[in-house]
């Protein structure tokens, strides 16, 4: 004998007839429970596309190597206590075997600069003319983000400051810091006067614009040659000056090699200031 059973849904309407064998009871399939929770769409994992890979610098085989790219625990130099003027420095007093590479202006955006700085693996400080940086901010932001670079102030127009009024100098210094902050998101705290020419008004205006120090230099690199103010070797704590020029590759390689020959390693200037 075949027993016919019917099942009813929750609405009381009969569903399909299920045949049953003698001695066995077939239990109708249960309907899935009705969820009262809000429906959550499935989450699809997304990843941002990686930034384009920059090919190695064609000059990578000429880059000197350093045992340590930067000191693990740099010593901070105390600045002169003056409530009215920024400190004026050309070197850092430190016992660490380090020197500091600074690159000025920004007029010439050499196509090899980014790869060369990145592949060297050492920190650099860029003292940029803000109006020039504004012409191509991506060039400098790429160096900052893909290499090990910081950006500091070097006036708005690169005009001579020494001998000008406090207010005129303040407009150049504060104006450059304001513009660089707008371009790159971080306000500079260091300043270099064009040509290194400064006077008491420069130091006072720099202080009032929030600059910790105004930097000169001990060595300058031109046409692939390092020029020394004293002696024939870079000394520990020295600040080295070069520029964004057509000779950038030769100048940068010369600066690195001179630091290497002196038994020093490039370090980040900002790490040695409070």
Locations of the language-model features?
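C-terminal motif of bacterial Sec signal peptides marking the signal peptidase cleavage site
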Residues: 3-7
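N-terminal low-complexity, Pro/Thr-rich disordered segments
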Residues: 8-90
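CE4/NodB-like, metal-dependent polysaccharide N-deacetylase domain
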Residues: 21-24, 118, 123-125, 159, ...
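Active-site beta->alpha N-cap acidic-glycine motif
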Residues: 58-153, 157-160, 179
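C-terminal domain-boundary segment and adjacent tail
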Residues: 81-94, 248-274
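Structural recognition of the beta-strand scaffold that forms the well-ordered cores
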Residues: 99-103, 124-128, 150-153, 189-192, ...
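Acidic-and-aromatic substrate-binding clefts and catalytic sites of carbohydrate-active enzymes
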Residues: 106-109, 128-138, 160-167, 192-198, ...
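His/Asp/Glu-enriched short active-site or ligand-binding loop at hydrolase and phosphoryl-transfer sites
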Residues: 187, 197-236, 266-273
